[in-house]
């Protein structure tokens, strides 16, 4: 006959047909229970912890505790810090500073580049270029010397035929646009009036 196997819970003989084998122990089917809630377990639902049986709900959680005087913690704190060799005195790039500023090549090239000349701006002047003058006539009713120079300068500016022609063309175009705007405004008012009459 075979040697009798003892139950892991009650220490009585557990026959093979009446027992459950779990965690290298044999248990009676009635003894195979959770040690916390005494619910009956099966091979699929049991959990074993420190030689005791538990259901999945009551299985104790393993948590590590930090002990400040443990050898592993002391070794970790006293371990040498990782230092890359030679980084303290390392230079990146060349030993000289970069030339950024007015002496750089890009700046020098930009300053020495030929300037663009915009067509038609050579003779354009806004205003008279000096202080504003007031028309003060002398006792004889004639303009003073400074006022005569100003009048002569103004006459010279309007003697330029191209600018005068361009000014007249722009003035004519403006008048045409103004007339078109007025016609559109009148048409809009007529349509609005017609709409109100229909209502």
Swiss-Prot record:
GO terms for cellular component: actin cytoskeleton; cortical actin cytoskeleton; extracellular matrix; filopodium; lamellipodium; nucleus; plasma membrane; pseudopodium. Residues 134-199 are annotated as: Disordered. GO terms for molecular function: actin filament binding; metal ion binding. Disruption phenotype: Cells exhibit longer microtubules than normal. During mitosis, interphase microtubules and the spindle persist far longer than in wild-type cells. Residues 5-65 form the LIM zinc-binding domain. Residues 175-199 have a biased composition (Acidic residues). It is found in: Cytoplasm; Cytoplasm, Cell cortex; Nucleus; Cell projection, Lamellipodium. Pfam families: LIM. Residues 146-155, 163-174 have a biased composition (Low complexity). Keywords: Cell cycle, Cell projection, Cytoplasm, Cytoskeleton, LIM domain, Metal-binding, Nucleus, Zinc. SUPFAM superfamilies: Glucocorticoid receptor-like (DNA-binding domain). The keyword Protein transport does not apply. GO terms for biological process: actin filament bundle assembly; chemotaxis to cAMP. May interact with rac1A. Associates with the actin cytoskeleton and may regulate actin polymerization in lamellipodia, through a rac1-dependent signaling pathway. May play a role in cell motility. Involved in cytokinesis by regulating the microtubule system and linking it to the cortical actin network. This is LIM domain-containing protein E. It comes from Dictyostelium discoideum.
């Amino acid at each position: 006959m075979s040697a009798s196997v003892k139950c892991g819970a009650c220490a009585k003989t557990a026959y093979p047909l009446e027992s459950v084998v779990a965690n290298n122990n044999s248990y009676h089917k009635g003894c195979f229970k959770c040690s916390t809630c005494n619910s009956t377990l099966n091979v699929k639902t049991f959990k074993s912890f420190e030689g005791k049986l538990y259901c999945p709900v009551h299985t104790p959680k393993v948590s590590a505790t930090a002990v400040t005087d443990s050898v592993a913690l002391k070794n970790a704190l006293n371990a040498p810090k990782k230092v890359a060799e030679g980084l303290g005195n390392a230079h990146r790039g060349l030993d000289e500073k970069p030339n950024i500023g007015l002496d750089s090549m890009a700046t020098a090239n930009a300053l020495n580049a030929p300037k663009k000349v915009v067509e038609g701006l050579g003779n354009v002047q806004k205003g008279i270029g000096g202080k504003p003058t007031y028309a003060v006539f002398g006792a004889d009713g004639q303009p003073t010397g400074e006022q005569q120079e100003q009048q002569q300068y103004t006459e010279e500016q309007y003697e330029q035929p191209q600018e005068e022609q361009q000014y007249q063309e722009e003035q004519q175009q403006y008048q045409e646009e103004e007339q078109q705007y007025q016609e559109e405004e009148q048409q809009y008012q007529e349509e609005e009036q017609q709409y109100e009459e229909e209502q």
